[in-house]
Amino acid sequence: VKNVKRTRHKKYLLMLSLVMILGLSLGLTGCGQWESMGAETHPSPDPVSSPVEGSPLDCEKFMAAKDVARVLAPLPREYEEQAEIVVVPHHALAADMTAEALLQAGAADKDLFIIIGPNHANQGANIIVSNQGYEGGGHPLKNRLAWDDATLEALTQESTLLDNHSFQNEHSIGMPASLIAQINPHGEILPIICRRELTLEEGAQLFSTLAPLLDEDTLIVASVDFSHHLSGPDAQGRNEQMAELIQAGKSAQVSRLDSTYLDAPGMMAALMEYAQTQQLTPTILRKATAADYLGTGYDREVTSYLTIQYR
């Protein structure tokens, strides 16, 4: 009997060890299929819990308020020029690039920020919106859709879905929102996430629906990380290729690219087409990769970044 108990106990310990090893390996796999492995990746999101009705989403989970303040501290808040569209990273490692580009686009003086980013889970409708507010560093950011019933109705009459749950751990919106909350806490946001499969036709319809809001007091913030799964040198090369495609307005070609080029091909292509209809010209502000932040000795896969303005 004792031998049987010992055998069962050993089997139990073996199974427990296997479960722990499996759990550890799953915990190290990054935040999703479109993110690269390595130190520069985003952590796995926590399980989504139901938000408290009417409460803002805390930006602290995306970027700590003290880190936002540190990034913003050396940057001037006022710029003479303003932009209609700005493309920024949502990887917190490159928050200085995002902050600088937002400020250079005139974010301190805008009334509305339409933040459009990739749906990293790549689930649900091709376009999803939220009417939940955000809060960063004690500064609340109101959501335009919380009170603008006409815009919400116009958006959701098409194929767009209203789903606050999809935004609870979505850093493509949360990271830029954490910066905007401290740059311009009196502004409003309108968060939108798009699946990779977003078509140019769906993108055109989205911008057509948003047209009544797109004036000089609105800034479109396209939240995009560029190449994934490549070495530092290869990622630099992809940045050059992407810059050329964007400056040449090759939207159809961009829409067909994979995550070794960017994480939001459909959305970026739709944005490029909208910019062309408005006769806006792209200017590349900065190019970088995660290796630029992590040091020359970093030889694992990296994410790359571009900041772009459209005027």
Kindly label every feature range from the protein language model.
Residues S17-L22:
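Hydrophobic helical h-region of N-terminal Sec-dependent signal peptides
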Residues Y12-M15:
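Short, hydrophobic alpha-helical membrane anchors of single-pass surface/secreted proteins
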Residues L28-G30:
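C-terminal motif of bacterial Sec signal peptides marking the signal peptidase cleavage site
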Residues V1-K10:
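N-terminal secretory signal peptides that target proteins for export/translocation
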Residues A288-R311:
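Long, Lys/Arg- and hydrophobic-enriched amphipathic alpha-helices
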